[in-house]
Amino acid sequence: MKFFTVRHNVYLLLSTVLMLSFSCQNRPNADKQPAETMTTHLKFDEVLFSADSISPLHVVNWSQQYPYFFNLFVNKIIHLPPADSAALALSLQKFVSDKDVKDIHARVEKVFSSADKDKLFSEIEVFLSNYKNELGTQPVKHLITFLSAFNYAVITSDSAIGIGLDMYLGSDCEFYPSIGIPQYAYQHFSKDYILCDVIKGWYQSEHDVDEEKNEFLSRMIYYGKQWYFTSVMAPQMQDTILTG
């Protein structure tokens, strides 16, 4: 299981600059027939905020309906302590009733319509299809959107990919500078970058960078491979997004 904030660094920049000389001429995979994929789609941000009042029954039902995500969301994404269903329902109600969280949710609803989320799921399914074409298996079965309270942009597990929509509200969103995110980072916090971040996040979940091996060249090679993987999985992606 992996959690990712949005990462943009000098190693990726330099390695991708070296790759750009052939990228436009040699984008792989563009003409292959799509492989069939089977996925479920969960707009958990809508599920969570649609309840008038969160009850223990909601907690039990969500835990049973979404076993691949609910406990992960509660314990790892919004960091609520372990509790019984009654106490957890109370904690979740406090979360969705918090003024700041309500403001974030309102902005998410403004930026992302339900149709926008469907389009996002479709784009990720193309990535999964390309992955299956190249590597023979479909990596995950569940695609999820959620509100993370600015904790995570992308999460991956052995069965799911999730997107924290509140990390993609646009570079003009006033929330980001107010919580100390630097401008060079939040200038990429828009929906245009979601698919790229999902693919890069998945690559990082399968290929950890060696933290003990901090040589400049080694990291350039790592991020160059990540760039190439992303270009294979999304051959139509604009270079400005790939290198962002």
What are these regions (language model features)?
Residues 2-12:
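Bacterial N-terminal signal peptides that target proteins for export
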Residues 12-13, 243:
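A generic signature of intrinsically disordered, low-complexity regions enriched in glycine/proline
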Residues 14-18:
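Hydrophobic helical h-region of N-terminal Sec-dependent signal peptides
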Residues 20-23:
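C-terminal motif of bacterial Sec signal peptides marking the signal peptidase cleavage site
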Residues 25-94:
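N-terminal mature-domain "stem" immediately C-terminal to a signal peptide or N-terminal signal-anchor/transmembrane
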Residues 93-244:
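Acidic/His-rich structured neighborhood in mature extracellular/periplasmic domains
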